[in-house]
Each structure stands twice: as structure tokens, then as C-alpha cells.
Amino acid sequence: MSLLEKFERYPLTFGPTPIEHLPRLTAALGGKVDIYAKRDDCNSGLAMGGNKLRKLEYIVPDAIASGADTLVSIGGVQSNHTRMVAATAAKIGMKCVVIQEKWVPHYDAVYDRVGNILMTKLMGADSRLVEDGFDIGIRKSWEDAIQSVEDAGGKPYAIPAGASVHKFGGLGYVGFAEEVAAQEKDLGFIFDYIIVCVVTGSTQGGMIVGFAALDRADRVIGIDASGTLQQTRDQVRKIVDATSELVNLGRSVREDEIVINPDYAYPAYGVPSEETNEAIRLAARTEAMITDPVYEGKSMQGMIDLARKGFFPEGSKVLYAHLGGAPALNGYSYYYKDG
């Protein structure tokens, strides 16, 4: 029985996302481990999709039931999350206010005019640029935005950064784990490792709960892209505990089942290293799989490096969770002007 059976879901995605073998990337990494990708970057027709839609599917019913008329959320200037909240609001007929903080020390001349923020505005969201820097916690700028909607006579529905510390924020990726388990039956094998980027925490947190039900939570390897490891780990822990209780997992998730690798977040959140850029190019040139410099490029870098170092035993089958994020590339065009 699904852990999610009792929860209402508002469909924003096409359904189960495909799992794709990546033979050319596998070969480029020496062929000792088989690399696959689960394509959550291709999960919806809503504004290029991405992982946040899995989360929002379980949040929207609560938003509608609350009688809200405005979704209010927060992210960085090139936030995938605020793009997805804007898309969701447009789809369900609500207004949208998003705070876009300057989380990233990146100064491309078009950074605040292209990619995610452009699409967010195009979908009618009230996008408010704020100078505050990076922090995955609850932000005053977001609380002020919620209050501003109330002051104008509206009824806001608050969605935190990444939809992560929302009470239903982890449910979507519990569903991801159940979906992978069903697909493994068709594939005829079980993945040895799942690689996923982690920043605000509910994507990996939900996966951990879902795979804990299968006694495989420690095979979910989070690649930190926040650069604030302890804060991220603490938030993942809270999300895991809250989500476990919500879905009646029936046991506590052990500390050793929460695996986060901090080695690839440098030099800062939202700033790619040369190794990140090399990973982005390798995925693009072997598999035409586009990753971004903020999140997926760093998790791709991590997976590539771990494979080359021999972290995965020979013969392992590794599943890369592609969470989306390609629109952000437009804000980093100078890095890739020559490919």
C-alpha cells in the first residue's frame, strides 16, 4: 500500500517520469558502473517542469481548501521554485507573489532579466527583487510579502523556499521513491545508489522517507549545493522526521540513513566551479542532457567524481535524479558562450 494513499493530489505533472539509461556517459566514466537518469526535468508541460511540481501537487489541494487567492513564495533571482509556483498559480487560477532574493554572488548583466525570472514574470507573477543574501531558513522578506497581500485585502497561501518546510513538502518525493520501486520491477533490477542534489531539503528528505520504507534510505546520496552543510542537514532531518510521522512510516529514520556529501558545493551557492562546468559539458556532449550551474551541475559533478574515484563498486547501477533547472543557464551565459 502506498504511504501517500490518504493524501489528496492535484495533478500538475504528466505522471511517472521515465528512467533512461545513459550509455555514452557510462562509457565516458570508464564503463565500470551503469548510469541511469530519472527525468523529473521532463515531468510536465507547465513552464518546463521540474522537481518542485511533485511537491506542489500535494500542496495545491490545501491551498484551494484554505480559500486563498494568492500563492506567496520565495527564492533566489534565478529560482526554479518561484517559476514553478508562478506556473502553478496560473494553472489553478490564483494570483502569485514571489520574493526573489539575491542569493548568488553572480553579476552577469542579464542575470535578473532572463531564464527563470523572465518566465516567472511572463506567467503574471508579481516578482519582487530583494537585496538579502542566501539563507534557506524562514525569511522576513517573505513574511512581509504575505502581510502585504493581507493588507491589500487578499488571502495569501504561504509556500516556503523550495516548498521544503511546508507540512506537505516532503510527500512528492516519497512518491518518487515508490515510483522508482515500481519501475525497478519492470527493469528487473534494483538501483544500488540514487544521486540527488540537496539545498532546502525536501526532495532528498522525501526520498529518504520513501526509500526507508524499503530499507534503502542510506543509498540516497545527497550532493550538497548549499555550502551551508549543517543548516541543510538539520533541515533535512526535520523534514524527514515530520514526513515520517505524517505518512505513518512506523519507525524513526536513523542518522546514518541521511547521507549528504559536501564536497561539491564550492565555491559558493549558485556559483559553478570549473569542475561543475566540465560536468555540465560532459552530460550535454555525451547524452544531450542539460544540467544547470546551481543545482544539477553540482550533483552531476558529484556523481562523475564519485564514479571516477571508485566510490561505487564495480557493476553498480546508479540512478541520477534529474530535478530540472535548465532555464537558469540563461543567467550564466558568459560561462558557456563558447560551449
UniProtKB/Swiss-Prot annotation:
GO molecular function: 1-aminocyclopropane-1-carboxylate deaminase activity; D-cysteine desulfhydrase activity; pyridoxal phosphate binding
CDD domains (UniProt xref): ACCD
Listed EC numbers: 3.5.99.7
Annotated positions of the N6-(pyridoxal phosphate)lysine modification: K52
GO biological process, one term: amine catabolic process
Catalytic reaction list: 1-aminocyclopropane-1-carboxylate + H2O = 2-oxobutanoate + NH4(+)
NCBIfam families registered for this protein in UniProt: ACC_deam
Function: Catalyzes a cyclopropane ring-opening reaction, the irreversible conversion of 1-aminocyclopropane-1-carboxylate (ACC) to ammonia and alpha-ketobutyrate. Allows growth on ACC as a nitrogen source.
Name used for this protein in its record: 1-aminocyclopropane-1-carboxylate deaminase
Organism: Rhizobium leguminosarum bv. viciae
Organism lineage string: Bacteria, Pseudomonadati, Pseudomonadota, Alphaproteobacteria, Hyphomicrobiales
Gene name per UniProt: acdS
